[in-house]
Amino acid sequence: MKYMGSKARLSAKILEVMDVSGRDYVEPFAGGMNMIAAVDGANSRHANEINKYVVAMFEALVSGWVPPHITREDYSRLRMLIGDDHVIGWAGIACSYSGKWFGGYAGVVETKQGVRDYQKEALNNALKQAEKLQGVSFSSCCYRDLEIPDGSLVYCDPPYAGTTGYKDSFDSVSFWRWAKRTARYCDVYVSEYAAPDFATEILSMPVKSSLSANGVSGGSKASVEKLFKL
């Protein structure tokens, strides 16, 4: 599913260097669930996302819910957080441009390539993704409050330092302190553009994203995304 900062295109490369086989796999920043949906062979999979509406949406999809078409009027109402949590989550992500939380209504649009029904595309992708999320446990809390079993493989895709476009500011310094503590009893991997000296770079990938390392959002920006291990 399209989601701002999604790892859909990078999941295969990242999983090549993380041995998840037989491990408890935990994602504190699961977002659009594209990464965890690609994880195979883990003992268990747990997805945490602080946005409760997104979590409610995925829980509903995994349970067999088929989202309805969202009109502009629906979108405006749901944007005010009036409605069922899972429907708000669907409108906020799947019915918004580039998967940005209520970043503009996406419906049927005339493009240079022809007519595109963005909601239909999102629905088809979501139903396929829901099949790959069977067996995943979900939670919605701050990463610091997440209970992580000892020995887990923890993959973190936090909001990147110096980027814009996310709903709230993110304290990257506090996050890295938490990651260092967590690495005492787990294998911790972090996707970022840069990291403190105590993290080891193990993968470097050129990407194009709507969030660039120079802090500018919007459009397509070329960046080098890295994977670090603690």
Language-model regions: role of each:
Residues M1-I50, E121, G135-C156, Y160-L230:
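Class I S-adenosyl-L-methionine
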Residues G41-S139, R144-D145:
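Class I S-adenosyl-L-methionine-dependent methyltransferase module
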